From Swiss-Prot:
Glycans are attached at residue 207. Residues 24-27, 88-89 are annotated as: Involved in metalloproteinase-binding. Pfam families: TIMP (PF00965). It comes from Bos taurus (Bovine). Mediates a variety of processes including matrix regulation and turnover, inflammation, and angiogenesis, through reversible inhibition of zinc protease superfamily enzymes, primarily matrix metalloproteinases (MMPs). Regulates extracellular matrix (ECM) remodeling through inhibition of matrix metalloproteinases (MMP) including MMP-1, MMP-2, MMP-3, MMP-7, MMP-9, MMP-13, MMP-14 and MMP-15. Additionally, modulates the processing of amyloid precursor protein (APP) and apolipoprotein E receptor ApoER2 by inhibiting two alpha-secretases ADAM10 and ADAM17. One of its GO terms (biological process) is response to cytokine. This is Metalloproteinase inhibitor 3.
Length: 211
Protein backbone atom coordinates (compact mmCIF):
# COMPACT_ATOMS: atom_id res chain seq x y z
CA UNK A 1 0.00 0.00 0.00
CA UNK A 2 1.43 3.39 -0.96
CA UNK A 3 1.36 6.30 1.53
CA UNK A 4 -1.43 8.04 -0.35
CA UNK A 5 -3.63 4.95 -0.44
CA UNK A 6 -3.26 4.73 3.33
CA UNK A 7 -4.30 8.37 3.65
CA UNK A 8 -7.37 7.83 1.51
CA UNK A 9 -8.44 4.96 3.74
CA UNK A 10 -8.54 7.44 6.60
CA UNK A 11 -10.13 10.35 4.76
CA UNK A 12 -12.35 8.73 2.18
CA UNK A 13 -15.61 6.85 2.59
CA UNK A 14 -15.29 3.80 0.36
CA UNK A 15 -15.17 0.04 0.57
CA UNK A 16 -13.17 -2.46 -1.45
CA UNK A 17 -16.26 -3.16 -3.51
CA UNK A 18 -16.95 0.46 -4.37
CA UNK A 19 -14.32 2.29 -6.41
CA UNK A 20 -16.49 5.18 -7.67
CA UNK A 21 -15.17 8.63 -8.46
CA UNK A 22 -16.72 9.91 -5.24
CA UNK A 23 -14.27 7.89 -3.15
CA UNK A 24 -11.83 10.78 -2.69
CA UNK A 25 -13.03 13.03 0.14
CA UNK A 26 -11.01 16.04 1.28
CA UNK A 27 -11.63 18.70 3.91
CA UNK A 28 -11.23 22.34 2.77
CA UNK A 29 -7.85 23.80 3.63
CA UNK A 30 -6.69 27.40 3.62
CA UNK A 31 -3.52 27.84 1.49
CA UNK A 32 -1.58 28.89 4.59
CA UNK A 33 -2.50 25.66 6.38
CA UNK A 34 -1.56 23.71 3.26
CA UNK A 35 1.80 25.48 3.21
CA UNK A 36 2.56 24.99 6.90
CA UNK A 37 1.47 21.33 6.95
CA UNK A 38 3.43 20.31 3.84
CA UNK A 39 6.96 18.92 3.73
CA UNK A 40 7.50 20.38 0.25
CA UNK A 41 6.12 23.50 -1.45
CA UNK A 42 7.47 24.28 -4.93
CA UNK A 43 6.67 25.98 -8.21
CA UNK A 44 7.36 23.62 -11.11
CA UNK A 45 6.51 22.63 -14.65
CA UNK A 46 5.65 19.04 -15.56
CA UNK A 47 7.87 17.78 -18.38
CA UNK A 48 7.02 14.07 -18.43
CA UNK A 49 5.04 11.26 -16.80
CA UNK A 50 5.23 7.50 -16.34
CA UNK A 51 2.77 4.97 -14.91
CA UNK A 52 4.25 2.51 -12.43
CA UNK A 53 2.39 -0.70 -11.60
CA UNK A 54 2.08 -0.17 -7.85
CA UNK A 55 -1.09 -0.60 -5.79
CA UNK A 56 -4.54 -1.48 -7.21
CA UNK A 57 -4.43 1.18 -9.97
CA UNK A 58 -0.76 2.04 -10.16
CA UNK A 59 1.24 5.13 -9.30
CA UNK A 60 1.72 8.05 -11.67
CA UNK A 61 5.19 9.57 -11.54
CA UNK A 62 5.55 13.06 -13.00
CA UNK A 63 8.95 14.39 -14.01
CA UNK A 64 9.14 18.08 -13.19
CA UNK A 65 11.39 21.07 -13.74
CA UNK A 66 11.57 22.86 -10.40
CA UNK A 67 11.39 26.64 -10.73
CA UNK A 68 11.45 27.67 -7.08
CA UNK A 69 11.23 26.07 -3.65
CA UNK A 70 9.26 27.75 -0.85
CA UNK A 71 9.37 25.03 1.79
CA UNK A 72 11.32 21.81 2.23
CA UNK A 73 14.94 22.88 1.86
CA UNK A 74 16.11 20.39 4.49
CA UNK A 75 13.75 17.58 3.43
CA UNK A 76 14.52 17.54 -0.29
CA UNK A 77 16.32 20.61 -1.66
CA UNK A 78 15.67 19.67 -5.28
CA UNK A 79 12.63 17.74 -6.50
CA UNK A 80 12.77 15.97 -9.85
CA UNK A 81 9.82 13.57 -9.53
CA UNK A 82 6.45 13.69 -7.80
CA UNK A 83 4.32 10.63 -7.10
CA UNK A 84 0.53 10.38 -6.97
CA UNK A 85 -2.09 7.65 -7.18
CA UNK A 86 -2.98 6.93 -10.81
CA UNK A 87 -6.72 6.83 -10.01
CA UNK A 88 -8.67 9.99 -9.14
CA UNK A 89 -10.92 7.83 -6.96
CA UNK A 90 -7.88 7.39 -4.72
CA UNK A 91 -7.18 11.15 -4.79
CA UNK A 92 -4.72 10.84 -7.67
CA UNK A 93 -3.74 14.12 -9.28
CA UNK A 94 -3.90 14.78 -13.02
CA UNK A 95 -1.37 17.32 -14.33
CA UNK A 96 -0.75 18.64 -17.85
CA UNK A 97 2.64 17.93 -19.41
CA UNK A 98 4.64 20.81 -20.94
CA UNK A 99 1.75 23.22 -20.54
CA UNK A 100 1.55 25.05 -17.21
CA UNK A 101 3.61 25.95 -14.19
CA UNK A 102 2.05 24.63 -10.98
CA UNK A 103 2.22 25.40 -7.31
CA UNK A 104 2.70 21.94 -5.78
CA UNK A 105 2.53 20.90 -2.13
CA UNK A 106 3.14 17.44 -0.75
CA UNK A 107 4.75 15.09 1.75
CA UNK A 108 8.02 13.16 1.67
CA UNK A 109 8.05 9.38 2.20
CA UNK A 110 11.18 7.27 1.75
CA UNK A 111 12.90 10.10 -0.08
CA UNK A 112 10.04 10.63 -2.56
CA UNK A 113 7.54 13.47 -2.85
CA UNK A 114 3.88 12.47 -2.85
CA UNK A 115 0.90 14.68 -3.64
CA UNK A 116 -2.78 14.30 -4.47
CA UNK A 117 -6.18 15.94 -4.70
CA UNK A 118 -6.23 16.65 -0.95
CA UNK A 119 -3.08 18.74 -1.25
CA UNK A 120 -3.08 22.37 -2.35
CA UNK A 121 -2.16 22.25 -6.05
CA UNK A 122 -2.94 25.11 -8.40
CA UNK A 123 -1.83 26.50 -11.73
CA UNK A 124 0.63 29.29 -11.02
CA UNK A 125 -1.17 31.75 -13.29
CA UNK A 126 -4.38 31.27 -11.28
CA UNK A 127 -2.88 32.24 -7.92
CA UNK A 128 -3.66 35.72 -6.63
CA UNK A 129 -0.93 38.25 -5.88
CA UNK A 130 -1.65 37.83 -2.16
CA UNK A 131 -1.21 34.06 -2.42
CA UNK A 132 2.13 34.49 -4.19
CA UNK A 133 3.30 36.90 -1.50
CA UNK A 134 2.06 34.45 1.11
CA UNK A 135 4.28 31.74 -0.34
CA UNK A 136 7.32 33.99 -0.14
CA UNK A 137 7.03 35.08 3.49
CA UNK A 138 3.55 35.61 4.97
CA UNK A 139 2.41 32.01 5.28
CA UNK A 140 5.67 31.07 6.99
CA UNK A 141 5.12 33.80 9.58
CA UNK A 142 1.69 32.36 10.37
CA UNK A 143 2.65 28.74 10.93
CA UNK A 144 2.35 29.23 14.70
CA UNK A 145 -1.18 30.56 14.26
CA UNK A 146 -4.25 28.35 13.90
CA UNK A 147 -6.87 28.88 11.20
CA UNK A 148 -10.20 27.77 12.66
CA UNK A 149 -12.79 26.65 10.09
CA UNK A 150 -16.32 27.99 10.55
CA UNK A 151 -19.08 26.10 8.72
CA UNK A 152 -22.12 27.65 10.39
CA UNK A 153 -23.00 30.47 12.79
CA UNK A 154 -22.37 31.18 15.57
CA UNK A 155 -18.66 30.39 15.73
CA UNK A 156 -15.94 32.07 17.74
CA UNK A 157 -12.21 32.10 18.27
CA UNK A 158 -11.29 30.42 21.55
CA UNK A 159 -7.65 31.47 21.89
CA UNK A 160 -5.46 34.38 20.86
CA UNK A 161 -3.61 32.32 18.25
CA UNK A 162 -6.74 31.64 16.14
CA UNK A 163 -8.14 33.28 13.01
CA UNK A 164 -11.76 32.52 12.10
CA UNK A 165 -12.08 31.18 8.54
CA UNK A 166 -15.57 31.84 7.17
CA UNK A 167 -15.20 31.24 3.42
CA UNK A 168 -17.32 28.07 3.58
CA UNK A 169 -20.57 29.87 4.33
CA UNK A 170 -19.86 33.30 2.84
CA UNK A 171 -21.28 34.54 -0.45
CA UNK A 172 -17.89 33.93 -2.06
CA UNK A 173 -17.87 30.21 -1.25
CA UNK A 174 -14.72 28.11 -1.22
CA UNK A 175 -12.10 29.06 -2.18
CA UNK A 176 -13.23 32.48 -1.02
CA UNK A 177 -11.88 35.89 -0.17
CA UNK A 178 -9.89 34.84 2.90
CA UNK A 179 -8.29 31.98 0.97
CA UNK A 180 -7.34 34.18 -1.95
CA UNK A 181 -6.28 37.39 -0.23
CA UNK A 182 -5.46 36.91 3.47
CA UNK A 183 -2.87 35.32 5.74
CA UNK A 184 -3.28 34.64 9.46
CA UNK A 185 -0.25 36.25 11.13
CA UNK A 186 0.77 36.88 14.74
CA UNK A 187 0.61 40.61 15.46
CA UNK A 188 1.96 42.75 18.29
CA UNK A 189 0.60 41.57 21.61
CA UNK A 190 0.79 37.94 20.56
CA UNK A 191 -2.62 37.80 18.89
CA UNK A 192 -3.11 36.21 15.48
CA UNK A 193 -5.33 38.04 13.01
CA UNK A 194 -6.04 38.17 9.29
CA UNK A 195 -3.60 40.31 7.38
CA UNK A 196 -3.73 41.78 3.91
CA UNK A 197 -1.50 44.58 2.70
CA UNK A 198 1.23 45.54 0.33
CA UNK A 199 3.82 45.96 3.11
CA UNK A 200 4.79 43.24 5.60
CA UNK A 201 3.40 43.76 9.14
CA UNK A 202 6.92 43.96 10.61
CA UNK A 203 9.68 44.74 8.14
CA UNK A 204 12.38 44.00 10.70
CA UNK A 205 11.61 40.26 10.72
CA UNK A 206 10.54 39.66 7.13
CA UNK A 207 12.69 39.30 4.05
CA UNK A 208 10.11 40.60 1.60
CA UNK A 209 10.68 39.43 -1.96
CA UNK A 210 8.39 39.74 -4.93
CA UNK A 211 6.56 36.60 -6.10
Amino acid sequence: MTPWLGLVVLLGSWSLGDWGAEACTCSPSHPQDAFCNSDIVIRAKVVGKKLLKEGPFGTMVYTIKQMKMYRGFTKMPHVQYIHTEASESLCGLKLEVNKYQYLLTGRVYDGKMYTGLCNFVERWDQLTLSQRKGLNYRYHLGCNCKIKSCYYLPCFVTSKNECLWTDMFSNFGYPGYQSKHYACIRQKGGYCSWYRGWAPPDKSIINATDP
